[in-house]
Amino acid sequence: MKKDDIQKFEEYCSSVYEAFNSPLNINWEMNEKSLIGFFSIGSDYYKISCLRYDFNIWTYKFFFLDKNKDEFSQTSKGDTNNKMKVLSTIRSGMEYLINLKNPNGLIFMASDDSEARKKIYFSFAEELEKKFKYKLLSNRKENYQIYILYKNIDLDLVLDEIDKIKNEI
């Protein structure tokens, strides 16, 4: 490799690292049972939906505004140049939820063909497990991978609650 190529690669890696560690500002709306966040980058709009269930178990979902349908969708799209900032913001939102609501359980999932996204979400789950002293359980079926973080609660209670709300996850 030429010296210029190495320098370009290092600059690229540096910009990716910076974007991944620079979350966007999230505008939050909250009440006792929900925490809803909105953020945008360029002309793309995103929504984070966190809902509280029994035993202080929370779900965390991420949506992209599909401008063609004028509705939020869980299908991830948007400007690929901004993926790292969006992922950084998703991670930041998870930490905000944990710091604010101290959930006994946090449930989120990846539900598409992207293997990379599943790996990134798993790394988020591992970070949160260590940082906030959760236990982590993850399971995959077809294109769906669920991530369950829990503490201060019996796993059976978490699984029973998931069984009740599985259509909403």
Residue ranges and their predicted role:
Residues 1-169:
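Non-catalytic substrate-recognition and accessory regions of acyl/acetyltransferase enzymes
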